[in-house]
């Protein structure tokens, strides 16, 4: 045996080329053996898929198909080869992954070739519902960088993009559609201007949410948004204000104007934005720009049908006419009410802005600061509010440098400290939910579903609902001079309610400043209108308790010759 090996060794030393040729032949033969085993196991997997079960989808659902069993005996090379030969994975939106029941389409569970079904007419058939009260999945669409499918605003986030974040941003701006692309890009628009394609082409995971898909390369996963009433009044970056009669003196009321060919909302809004005006008024083929003033205060709305005249540049838009203007608010900031400062001389009188938590105190402070030009203070200190512009937050509440002091206190001693107070009251059903969201999600955030369905919510209602009533009753009883302001009335008629608050604070009213506030009323202190609870969190017992408390407060208000609680939350 040793002699034979020695002879072979000497032979290959004399002829090394033959040695390397032999080694190469040996490796080739070994590779073919491995490849053959890969083909065999892959064909068995294909047989399983043909019987109505996609092994990849089965794994995703926790199924026990034969695909995994056949792969156990494969070496590394065999497994890699098998993966490369598989039918391309069919990615789909969440509704496809979840719905495999009776209502699922026939192709949802088998090896269906999506590319063979593309057509413009397929759009209606491929529309799948992800209907959670916020949005409905429409499909996968082509997107061209030169000619976008959705032509509104867009934003990118290559770390934290999610489906909800994109939907929320588009909804807040009043767009009807939200589309995601490349896993990280969000596009908004009022109409889809591209054909739909195979669902398999929208196959990229969201950067901030691996469980969802966010389009693909030059492919948009598009959702139709169910807008809140306020969001529905938006048009992209502009806010629809309504239909208004032509002002008596257009030149004074709206100082900039131009005749535009192929008029559209975008063209007029863009022109007024460029000229730095906060209002864009469309009058047929003419575009007017200006600010809200006593000459054109936007308080007397006309029937919107009077403005239903098609734009020459966009058939589905209304551009008004010579007598009735369609008005939009642009993104230009009206600076007439943005200057704020501390009181020039320290006040000896302490004015409270009192409310139950969740009754809109932060929002009311924002409005008061804009309307008066003076900072508001706080009985507490909240660093997050200071960082958002409430500079009076750091002052001691007795400093006398702020126009009023935020407080949620309700004890006799604390109330009698103040010389006068504005008492904010809000529907307890809304206030309790707002405070619960604040407690578990921040000033403009949301509590999670786990908090709502867990022990926290019932315990919260049990402790806080009686406080809602006792807080109001204590301020009515111990307050030296109290002006009641209902959150709902302030929201419904901001101009007159805020005017009354400014007068109560002992300041001169600036109508221009109040009109400016109307255009900036939300500030950064409003929760998104898109995320809604999908169920009523109040039990029958909770409602019975809260209704009794509402009646108690209503009776006390009427005893003092006040209007009582607003109709929307008085028990019926």
UniProtKB/Swiss-Prot annotation:
Signal peptide as annotated in the record: none
Transmembrane portions of the chain: 19-39
Gene Ontology CC terms: Golgi membrane
SMART domains, per the entry: WSC
Main location (coarse class): Golgi
UniProt topological domain (Extracellular) ranges: 40-572
Subcellular location: Golgi apparatus membrane
Gene3D superfamilies according to UniProt: P-loop containing nucleotide triphosphate hydrolases (3.40.50.300)
GO molecular function, one term: sulfotransferase activity
Keywords: Glycoprotein, Golgi apparatus, Membrane, Repeat, Signal-anchor, Transmembrane, Transmembrane helix
Protein's UniProt keywords contain Kinase: no
Annotated membrane topology: Single-pass type II membrane protein
Entry's family note: Belongs to the WSCD family.
Name of the protein described by the UniProt record: Sialate:O-sulfotransferase 2
Species per Swiss-Prot/TrEMBL record: Danio rerio
UniProt gene name: wscd2
């Amino acid at each position: 045996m040793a002699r034979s090996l020695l002879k072979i060794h000497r032979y290959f030393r004399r002829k090394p080329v033959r040695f390397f040729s032999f080694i190469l032949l040996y490796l080739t033969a070994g590779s073919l053996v491995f490849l053959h085993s890969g083909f065999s196991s892959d064909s068995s997997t294909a047989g399983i898929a043909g019987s109505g079960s996609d092994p990849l989808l089965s794994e995703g659902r926790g199924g026990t198909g034969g695909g995994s069993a056949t792969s156990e005996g494969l070496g590394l090379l065999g497994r890699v080869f098998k993966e490369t030969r598989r039918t391309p994975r069919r990615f789909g939106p969440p509704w496809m992954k979840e719905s495999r029941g009776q209502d699922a389409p026939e192709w949802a569970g088998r090896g269906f070739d999506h590319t063979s079904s593309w057509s413009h007419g397929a759009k209606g058939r491929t529309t799948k519902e992800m209907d959670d009260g916020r949005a409905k999945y429409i499909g996968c669409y082509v997107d061209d960088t030169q000619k976008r499918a959705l032509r509104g605003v867009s934003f990118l986030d290559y770390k934290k993009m999610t489906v909800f974040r994109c939907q929320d941003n588009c909804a807040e701006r009043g767009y009807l559609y939200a589309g995601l692309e490349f896993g990280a890009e969000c596009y908004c628009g009022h109409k889809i201007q591209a054909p739909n394609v195979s669902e398999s082409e929208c196959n990229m995971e969201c950067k901030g949410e691996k469980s969802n898909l966010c389009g693909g390369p030059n492919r948009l996963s598009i959702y139709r948004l169910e807008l809140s009433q306020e969001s529905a009044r938006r048009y992209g970056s502009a806010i629809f204000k309504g239909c208004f009669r032509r002002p008596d003196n257009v030149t004074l009321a709206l100082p900039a104007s131009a005749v535009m060919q192929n008029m559209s909302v975008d063209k007029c809004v863009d022109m007024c934005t460029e000229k730095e005006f906060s209002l864009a008024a469309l009058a047929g083929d003419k575009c007017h720009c200006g600010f809200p003033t006593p000459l054109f205060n936007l308080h007397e709305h006309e029937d919107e049908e009077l403005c239903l005249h098609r734009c020459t540049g966009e058939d589905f838009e209304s551009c008004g006419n010579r007598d009735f203007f369609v008005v939009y608010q642009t993104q230009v900031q009206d600076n007439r009410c943005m200057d704020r400062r501390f009181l020039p001389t320290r006040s000896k009188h302490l004015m409270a802005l009192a409310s139950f938590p969740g009754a809109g105190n932060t929002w009311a402070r924002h409005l008061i600061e804009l309307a008066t030009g003076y900072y508001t203070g706080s009985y507490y200190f909240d660093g997050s509010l200071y960082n958002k512009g409430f500079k009076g937050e750091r002052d001691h509440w007795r400093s006398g440098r702020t126009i009023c002091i935020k407080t949620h206190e309700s004890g006799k001693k604390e109330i009698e400290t103040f010389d006068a107070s504005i008492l904010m009251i809000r529907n307890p059903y809304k206030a309790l939910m707002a405070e619960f969201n604040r407690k578990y999600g921040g000033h403009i955030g949301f509590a999670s579903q786990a908090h709502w369905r867990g022990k926290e919510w019932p315990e919260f209602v049990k402790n806080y609902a009686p406080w809602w009533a006792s807080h109001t009753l204590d301020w009515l009883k111990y307050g030296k001079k109290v002006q009641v302001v209902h959150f709902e009335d302030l929201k419904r008629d901001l101009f007159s309610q805020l005017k009354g608050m400014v007068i109560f604070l002992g300041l001169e009213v600036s109508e221009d400043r109040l009109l400016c506030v109307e255009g900036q009323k939300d500030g950064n202190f409003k929760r998104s209108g898109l995320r809604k609870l999908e169920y009523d969190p109040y039990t029958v017992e909770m409602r019975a308790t809260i209704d009794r408390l509402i009646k108690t407060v209503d009776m006390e208000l009427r005893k003092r010759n006040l209007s009582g609680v607003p109709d929307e939350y008085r028990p019926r």
